[in-house]
Amino acid sequence: MSLRTSYSVRSSTSQVPVSQVSIKRTTNVPTYRAASIYGGAGGQGTRISSASYSGVRSGLGVPSMSSSIQVSASGSTGEIMGNEKMAMQNLNDRLASYLEKVRILEQANSKLELKIREALEKRGPDVHDYSRFQPIVDELRKKIFDATTNNARLVLQIDNARLAADDFRVKYESELSIRQGVEADITGLRKVIDDTNLNRMNLESEIEALKEELIFLKKNHDNEVMELRNQISQSGVQVDVDAPKGQDLSQIMEEIRAKYEKMALKNQEELKAWHESQITEVQVQVTQNTEALQGARSEVNELRRQIQTLEIELESQKNLKGSLEGTLRDTEMRYNMEIENLNTIILQLEAELTQLRGNIQHQTQEYEALLNIKMKLEAEIATYRRLLDGGDFKLQDALEEQKKVKVMTVTQTLVDGKVVSSSTETKERKL
């Protein structure tokens, strides 16, 4: 890594009142150079002394330093000299502090590189060990299981609350209908009471009218009696009649009065009895209607209770039906899977059986061929034996015997690779 730092200093002294001094530092690569600048009087004899130093750039992100410093001054030559000295001193101080920081950073960088090298040597090749995450995974699985259980419990509670709300709504509707029925009954009873009060008022008005009529009749009777008495007292004629003595007029009037009083009393008693009988009849009707209403109300309540019980039982039966249907679906699915597995096994066994049958048929054919060869060889051996024995032998017999071949067919039944039954069939044919 190359290190290079260049400094350029320009100084001009003339009679021009404005003088410019510029100091530039350009860092191209991470190489550091410490420099001190000394200026002569009036800006003449300016020189730069520099010392190079290594830059610091570690893998930890310490950036390389690059700076550009420019100092400009204007004024007379004395002012320029004073400003240059102050600027140079300031720059020297800043460069010294930068060098100290660089040295500290280099030491820290070397220490970090050493630690990194040691850590890499100790750690060796990268091996992914996830065993330390297993407890966390187990805990998270447990939390997920608990959350799922709580969710199911909450769903069950929500369903129970919904059923309870439905039950309360049914009860509320039944109570509301009962209340409406009672209000309708109360309205009807109020109408009956109003009709009864109206009848009572009519009867009372009739009683008052009869009383007034009775008073009016009594008054007319008294007036007629008084008029008759006045006429009798004013008339001076005495008439003697040879007739039996008539009844006393006052006695007749008393009798008439008593008769009318009895009639009025009788009418009053009859009216009172009729009124009481009407009231009693109305009360009996009201009592009967009330009892009938109470009976009908109790019957309605009982029917509503039965309806609620039947509705609850219906809901439970529906839930039971749903659970049984779900169980039936699961059972059918499981049985279908088992049937598919069994069908697969059956197909495999059928394929194996077909293969075994083919193998048996092939072996049977080979056995028949070997048996034919054996029989031919036995026939030839027998013929050769006859020839060797020197017995009676004809060429025609040998030819005929050679043309006859016995065929033996062996049939075996295999179950699970074992021979269950075996049968042998022998046939003789001519070649």
From Swiss-Prot:
The region called Head is annotated at 2-83
The segments labelled Coil 2 in the record are 253-390
What Pfam families does the record point to?
Filament
| Location of region: Linker 12 | 229-252
Fill in the PTM field for this protein.
Proteolytically cleaved by caspases during epithelial cell apoptosis.
* Annotated site, Stutter, chain positions: Y335
Identify the stretch annotated as signal peptide in this record: none
Region of interest (Linker 1), ranges: 120-136
Describe tissue expression: Expressed in simple epithelia such as intestinal mucosa, bile duct, hepatocytes, renal tubules, endothelia, ocular lens epithelium, and in a variety of mesenchymally-derived cells such as blood vessel endothelia, pillar gill cells, optic nerve glial cells, fibroblasts, interstitial cells, chondrocytes and ovarian theca cells. Also expressed in epidermis, pharyngeal mucosa, mucosa of anterior esophagus, gill mucosa and cornea.
Region Coil 1A, as annotated, extends over: 84-119
Q: Which UniProt keywords apply?
A: Coiled coil, Intermediate filament, Keratin, Phosphoprotein
Q: Where is this site: Cleavage?
A: D242, A243
Additional note from the record: There are two types of cytoskeletal and microfibrillar keratin: I (acidic; 40-55 kDa) and II (neutral to basic; 56-70 kDa).
Task performed by this protein: When phosphorylated, plays a role in filament reorganization.
Q: What protein family does this chain belong to?
A: Belongs to the intermediate filament family.
Could you describe the subunit structure of this protein?
A: Heterotetramer of two type I and two type II keratins. Keratin-18 associates with keratin-8.
Q: What is this protein called?
A: Keratin, type I cytoskeletal 18
Q: Which organism is it from?
A: Danio rerio (Zebrafish)
Q: Identify the coding gene.
A: krt18
